A protein has these predicted regions:
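Short hydrophobic helices that act as membrane-entry/anchoring signals
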Residues: 2-10
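N-terminal, well-ordered alpha-helical segments
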Residues: 2-3, 25, 42-46, 87, ...
Length: 174
């Protein structure tokens, strides 16, 4: 069932793929659990900033307790409210981090408020309403794709064939 829903959303996304007003790089995964997305997001932000680009990050803010969206995360934000990963990104990079479960809305806020040259989405691969210029999927090099099955039978959020459609696959920890 999860696999069918993922395929349906992906097909609809392909048909209606909107172009983002600025380059949007989505860093995500197709498995449940941690794969190292956030460290990669931090490294990408730092590399872009070092090249003189103005960067913003959008995120859902998984694990936070806030219900006030959109919300900007700063180095001083409370991780219990907004999630530990957005706070870590803000602390390590100093760039604006905008939280909203509706990542398209977070993107709109980031563009309107900060005029970035590049927006990086921490997660959001399956959030097809978010326009994107490129997709990077992070795979845990030790766990791989598990048994290769989609939820609830396995660890995949989408079929493994999705890896053929993304721009880059990064293997971590293996």
């Amino acid at each position: 069932l999860v696999s069918l829903e993922a395929k349906r959303r992906l097909q609809r996304f392909r048909k209606q793929r909107p172009l983002p007003p600025v380059p949007v790089l989505v860093v995500g995964n197709i498995t449940v659990g941690g794969t190292g997305k956030t460290p990669l997001v931090i490294a990408l932000v730092q590399a872009a900033v070092a090249r003189g680009l103005k960067v913003a990050v959008v995120s859902r803010g998984f694990g936070g307790k806030t219900d006030q969206y959109p919300r900007q995360v700063t180095a001083d934000s409370n991780a219990l409210e907004v999630g530990d990963e957005p706070v870590l990104i803000a602390r390590r990079t100093g760039v604006p981090v905008i939280l909203d479960p509706d990542r398209r809305n977070a993107l709109d806020v980031a563009i309107r408020e900060y005029s970035p040259d590049l927006v990086i989405s921490d997660d959001g691969l399956q959030h097809y309403a978010l326009p994107r210029s490129a997709e990077i999927v992070v795979v845990d090099g030790q766990r791989g794709l598990g048994n290769g099955r989609c939820l609830p039978e396995g660890p995949l959020r989408e079929p493994a064939t999705r890896l053929k459609e993304v721009d880059f696959v990064v293997s971590t920890g293996g």
